[in-house]
């Protein structure tokens, strides 16, 4: 055997401890792989195995879940809790509506629910309620397929049409897996004793076989990991950095301000050719310019103010790297 190849399980044993519980033993694994795969399988088994659950109930004469029914020993809250314990299987449909009608004194069980050929009630002996003398119950129960846990409040927020007056939305626990644990023991192959044996202990509600649940979880993991096996790097299109937007007026030459010849010449001597150059200068800086006095300064300030500009303004990234291109674009005056 190549030292670079990984061991895969040669022995897989299934011990059915009851119709609902089984132990699955797999060995050998390379050291550490038992924990890696055991934890992954456990998480998928608890969260991602599809199942069925009651999601809504409408009871004749009941407006909300805090009501009571004359002749019924349980209040509606207790009845709903008992109803959640009913285990069902939908063979083809994704949802269906079942009827529950009984008007005789005694125990109401899951077997009293009227079901079609598409629906299988796994625990028909499960107790839902107790009818006393003169009591009766008539209800419509919506059953759906799903995964994981779905609080009723989430569904009512997503779709207001799901319920009307008298409809009671139920918190739905779809997972058919009640409990999963795993242990790791030492395994041996020939002279190697540093190997793992993975033992998974799983209990379901009876709507799915424990062994089939493990197979389904394994297929989910294989499907998810297959993406990584075919992983190829893909170059995402990158946007070229764009220069920050610049007010077009700042790109215009100072000649467009129509200053006096004296003021315009003084600015050009200081290499102030664009309005963007000018507004970043302070009054003190301009007054140090040869031949530019207070009168010319006031003229410049008034012209800038008429364009909602002023001296001493700060501009980021000025001058722009491609200033000449900006000036040549349509709509920009050239100097």
UniProtKB/Swiss-Prot annotation:
Enzyme class: transferase
Disulfide bonds: none
GO cellular component: cytoplasm; DNA-directed RNA polymerase complex
Region feature Alpha C-terminal domain (alpha-CTD), mapped onto this chain: 246-335
SUPFAM superfamilies documented for this protein: C-terminal domain of RNA polymerase alpha subunit, Insert subdomain of RNA polymerase alpha subunit, RBP11-like subunits of RNA polymerase
Catalytic activity: RNA(n) + a ribonucleoside 5'-triphosphate = RNA(n+1) + diphosphate
Transmembrane intervals: none
Region feature (Alpha N-terminal domain (alpha-NTD)): 1-232
Domain of life (superkingdom): Bacteria
Gene Ontology process terms (BP): DNA-templated transcription
Single annotated GO MF: DNA-directed RNA polymerase activity
Keywords, in A-Z order: DNA-directed RNA polymerase, Nucleotidyltransferase, Transcription, Transferase
EC number: 2.7.7.6
InterPro entries the UniProt entry points to: DNA-dir_RNA_pol_insert, DNA-dir_RNA_pol_RpoA/D/Rpb3, DNA-dir_RpoA, RBP11-like, RNAP_asu_C, RNApol_insert_sf
UniProt record similarity statement: Belongs to the RNA polymerase alpha chain family.
Purpose: DNA-dependent RNA polymerase catalyzes the transcription of DNA into RNA using the four ribonucleoside triphosphates as substrates.
Entry comment, domain topic: The N-terminal domain is essential for RNAP assembly and basal transcription, whereas the C-terminal domain is involved in interaction with transcriptional regulators and with upstream promoter elements.
Subunit comment: Homodimer. The RNAP catalytic core consists of 2 alpha, 1 beta, 1 beta' and 1 omega subunit. When a sigma factor is associated with the core the holoenzyme is formed, which can initiate transcription.
Protein name: DNA-directed RNA polymerase subunit alpha
Organism: Nitrosomonas eutropha (strain DSM 101675 / C91 / Nm57)
